[in-house]
């Protein structure tokens, strides 16, 4: 090894990444290469837009699970001209070899699997801190944490009392990180907020946050709701969860699903996919729902629709997928049968009241798998500490379905960055013709061939031959 003179070493900037092991980069690169073959939408966008660089000048702060599939998304954004900084949106979802591969390519990445809450918020701050002292001008979010950090931080600049009463462990870490940053730079967040041209949001929970800000008149920039693109919600949420839920449960527990009684709480698109996956492996599946329409859908599919408090003692596998909080509360947890498996596939960890279990005896079996002894003497198996089981205990959705979602993300970033001045400070969805384009880009990969309308047929149903084929109000 050649020694670096002290004078030279002092001039070297610290690495613009935090990853578990940069030596995993080669492994990550091999998996990225395989994933690219399963992500035709993203690869098509590289071909279509690579020469024109529609994202040149975009500074994208990305907060989304740092997986292999996300690596393909990041490199697509870079290929289209963007400058990108990235953190994960979940403390357990990072694939360390993926983070290493992207960091080794020169993209600043701040993500490790199993990071602490303090580290999580420190890393989220890092994606907002451009090396030249500048700021991001775009946010690509999953769950709304990056957007929420900017918004809460800007409020705290003028009223620090918003940080006085954290409601849980997560908020304690978040509020402390904001106080630390404000002590260093009292206008950090408002400066970033004023420079953001737009936000694209990946998931149901983050979209709900955006609509809340819009309703209260607090949304300071336009946002695109990627989640409600048909080629996202009806594919990622449904078919992705149909494969990744049981992958996470089985990797974590090696349990035989056949013959078990499972309860899926929430029968939206995520719940529908989750229920199908468990039924497909032979479980008896029940559904808990608050929405009469979703409940009726579940009943018509042959599922028993039940109340949690009436069946809790009979269930072997609990899955929350509601986007709400304290869906499974302490009063339910303490009544569970011995060796019941408890997990969540909604975005945040508060669907299950994990905090109420902290004083009980915990035995860690392996990463993200804990045995908890209840007052009754029964033990339950908690997966991923109540966070996303498919990413905490497995590797998330398959590449092909994520290509649908991430193609929407790239199109949304291009739209807001290049045409942001045409958008008011509201939440939008991508137009139907782009939704259909995303679907078209994925058909050839799976050998699907579209039938084409004749002009007479198109005229008869009053649609263009090339689409769009459905009105915006159509429910797929």
UniProtKB/Swiss-Prot annotation:
Binding site for NAD(+): 203-205, 237, 266-271, 289, 324, 345-347, 390
UniProt EC number: 3.13.2.1
Superkingdom of the source species: Bacteria
Cofactor note: Binds 1 NAD(+) per subunit.
Residues involved in substrate binding: 67, 142, 202, 232, 236
Entry-linked PROSITE patterns: ADOHCYASE_1, ADOHCYASE_2
GO biological process, one term: one-carbon metabolic process
Alphabetized UniProt keyword annotations: Cytoplasm, Hydrolase, NAD, One-carbon metabolism
UniProt catalytic activity: S-adenosyl-L-homocysteine + H2O = L-homocysteine + adenosine
Location in or out of the cell: Cytoplasm
Keyword Hydrolase: yes
GO cellular component terms attached to this protein's record: cytosol
Family as reported in the entry's similarity comment: Belongs to the adenosylhomocysteinase family.
NCBIfam families found in the cross-reference section: ahcY, PRK05476.2-3
Protein name (record): Adenosylhomocysteinase
Lineage: Bacteria, Bacillati, Cyanobacteriota, Cyanophyceae, Synechococcales
């Amino acid at each position: 090894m050649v020694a670096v003179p002290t004078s030279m070493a002092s001039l070297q900037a610290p690495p613009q990444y935090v990853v578990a092991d940069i030596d995993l980069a080669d492994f990550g690169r091999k998996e990225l290469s395989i994933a690219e073959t399963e992500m035709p939408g993203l690869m098509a966008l590289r071909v279509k837009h690579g020469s024109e660089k529609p994202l040149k000048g975009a500074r994208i702060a990305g907060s989304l699970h740092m997986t292999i599939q996300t690596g393909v998304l990041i490199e697509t954004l870079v290929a289209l001209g963007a400058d990108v900084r990235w953190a994960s949106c979940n403390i357990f979802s990072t694939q360390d070899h993926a983070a290493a591969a992207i960091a080794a390519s020169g993209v600043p990445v701040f993500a490790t699997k199993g990071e602490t809450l303090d580290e999580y918020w420190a890393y989220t701050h890092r994606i907002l801190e451009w090396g030249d002292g500048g700021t991001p001008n775009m946010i690509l979010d999953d769950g709304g944490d990056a957007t929420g950090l900017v918004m809460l931080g800007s409020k705290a600049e003028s009223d620090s009392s918003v940080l006085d009463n954290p409601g849980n462990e997560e908020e304690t870490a978040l509020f402390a990180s904001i106080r630390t940053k404000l002590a260093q730079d009292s206008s950090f967040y408002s400066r970033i907020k004023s420079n953001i041209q737009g936000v694209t949001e990946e998931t149901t929970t983050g979209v709900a946050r955006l609509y809340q800000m819009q309703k209260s008149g607090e949304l300071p920039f336009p946002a695109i709701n990627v989640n409600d693109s048909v080629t996202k919600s009806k594919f990622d949420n449904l078919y992705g969860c149909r494969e990744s839920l049981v992958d996470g449960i089985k990797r974590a527990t090696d349990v035989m699903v056949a013959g078990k009684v499972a309860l899926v709480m929430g029968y939206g698109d995520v719940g529908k996919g989750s229920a199908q996956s468990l039924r497909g492996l032979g479980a008896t599946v029940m559904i808990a729902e608050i929405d009469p329409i979703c409940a009726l859908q579940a009943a018509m599919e042959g599922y028993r629709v039940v109340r949690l408090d009436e069946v809790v003692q009979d269930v072997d596998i609990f899955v929350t997928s509601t986007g709400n909080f304290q869906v499974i509360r302490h009063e339910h947890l303490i009544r569970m049968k011995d060796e019941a498996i408890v997990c969540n596939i909604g975005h945040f960890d508060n669907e299950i009241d994990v905090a109420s279990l902290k004083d009980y005896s915990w035995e860690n079996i392996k990463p993200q798998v804990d045995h908890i002894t209840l007052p009754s003497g029964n033990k339950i198996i908690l997966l991923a500490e109540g966070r996303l089981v498919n990413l905490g205990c497995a590797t998330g959705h398959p590449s092909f379905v994520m290509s649908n979602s991430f193609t929407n993300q790239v199109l949304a970033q291009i739209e807001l960055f290049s045409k942001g001045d045409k958008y008011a400070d509201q939440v939008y969805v991508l137009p139907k013709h782009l939704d259909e384009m995303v679907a078209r880009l994925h058909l050839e990969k799976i050998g699907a061939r579209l039938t084409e309308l004749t002009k007479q047929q198109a005229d008869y149903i009053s649609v263009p031959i090339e689409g769009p084929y459905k009105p915006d109000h159509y429910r797929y």
